[in-house]
Amino acid sequence: MQILLANPRGFCAGVDRAISIVERAIEMYGAPIYVRHEVVHNRYVVESLCERGAIFIEEISEVPDGSILIFSAHGVSQAVRAEARSRNLTMLFDATCPLVTKVHMEVARASRKGKEAILIGHAGHPEVEGTMGQYSNPNGGMYLVESPDDVWQLNVKDENNLCFMTQTTLSVDDTSAVIDALNTRFPKIVGPRKDDICYATTNRQEAVRNLANDADIVLVVGSKNSSNSNRLAELVQRMGKPAYLIDSAADIQEFWLQGAKCIGVTAGASAPDILVQQVIARLKDLGAGESIELSGREENIVFEVPKELRVEVKQID
């Protein structure tokens, strides 16, 4: 069996920054450090940070006075931000991905101008909750759609005063279909100046599409609650190839590999490379040969951590 590796795969700049913020806060201020929601959606990362002194919470009320709090990479609503600022916290750091913040600013701008806004996204995802929570104009409207059917059923106040934006980790193909429906249903709707789906999501979907063309099956390293990882597995399955979303090498079932001559491996944007290396090692134990990395788009984007945290610290082992 041959192993093919998608390129690019794994950590994106926003995830790298968010993890670094938690690591550096622990290094500088000591444990415990409180983080609202999982800083990124990856079990290995979250468990590793817990071992180092991070405490993940869902409600600001769970944070003791005098503590240090970090918002996750997914972002928070205006209400959550205001609640945190009203508390007696020693420090408050924001690990929201800058590309999510871009979408927040689009929604806030629409709210200020009194435009109704439609968000394309998955209900219940923390990024969607944070983005929807940037809209506060009682005379306008903020709506969530996930599919073309949602668009056809949507009623707004003023079809001539509409804009839309998207969650950053969606399927490029699915989102295109929803945008087509929006443009048909509301001809005067205005979209973002630049695509809201982030570069990492787009690049990893393109890479896994290329991978699936050559592989018999594809293993996607990522946690079940990772939106972008799920989209990678779904894309492969739609191409007619088996795809399995796995947290680690331990999840690999030998029968998946029966008859496969070429195994593709990729990783979601929140999955560290150590997990990919462990998957490769496990596949070799099961009889696979050396791994070959495909060519792909080069990524050199870096997002700086807050200036208060710009010190050198050891990374997660």
Curated annotation (Swiss-Prot):
GO terms for molecular function: 4 iron, 4 sulfur cluster binding; 4-hydroxy-3-methylbut-2-enyl diphosphate reductase activity; metal ion binding. Disulfide bonds: none annotated. Gene3D superfamilies: 3.40.50.11270, 4-hydroxy-3-methylbut-2-enyl diphosphate reductase, catalytic domain. GO terms for biological process: dimethylallyl diphosphate biosynthetic process; isopentenyl diphosphate biosynthetic process, methylerythritol 4-phosphate pathway; terpenoid biosynthetic process. Dimethylallyl diphosphate binds at residues 41, 74, 125, 226-228, 270. Its cofactor is [4Fe-4S] cluster. Its EC number is 1.17.7.4. InterPro entries: LytB/IspH (IPR003451). Belongs to the IspH family. Homodimer. [4Fe-4S] cluster binds at residues 12, 97, 198. It catalyses: isopentenyl diphosphate + 2 oxidized [2Fe-2S]-[ferredoxin] + H2O = (2E)-4-hydroxy-3-methylbut-2-enyl diphosphate + 2 reduced [2Fe-2S]-[ferredoxin] + 2 H(+); dimethylallyl diphosphate + 2 oxidized [2Fe-2S]-[ferredoxin] + H2O = (2E)-4-hydroxy-3-methylbut-2-enyl diphosphate + 2 reduced [2Fe-2S]-[ferredoxin] + 2 H(+). Catalyzes the conversion of 1-hydroxy-2-methyl-2-(E)-butenyl 4-diphosphate (HMBPP) into a mixture of isopentenyl diphosphate (IPP) and dimethylallyl diphosphate (DMAPP). Acts in the terminal step of the DOXP/MEP pathway for isoprenoid precursor biosynthesis. Binds 1 [4Fe-4S] cluster per subunit. The gene is ispH. This is 4-hydroxy-3-methylbut-2-enyl diphosphate reductase. It holds the Pfam family LYTB. Keywords: 4Fe-4S, Iron, Iron-sulfur, Isoprene biosynthesis, Metal-binding, Oxidoreductase. GO terms for cellular component: cytosol. It comes from the Bacteria. (2E)-4-hydroxy-3-methylbut-2-enyl diphosphate binds at residues 41, 74, 125, 168, 226-228, 270. The active site is at residue 127. Isopentenyl diphosphate binds at residues 41, 74, 125, 226-228, 270. The lineage of its organism: Bacteria, Pseudomonadati, Pseudomonadota, Gammaproteobacteria, Enterobacterales. Pathway: Isoprenoid biosynthesis; dimethylallyl diphosphate biosynthesis; dimethylallyl diphosphate from (2E)-4-hydroxy-3-methylbutenyl diphosphate: step 1/1; Isoprenoid biosynthesis; isopentenyl diphosphate biosynthesis via DXP pathway; isopentenyl diphosphate from 1-deoxy-D-xylulose 5-phosphate: step 6/6.
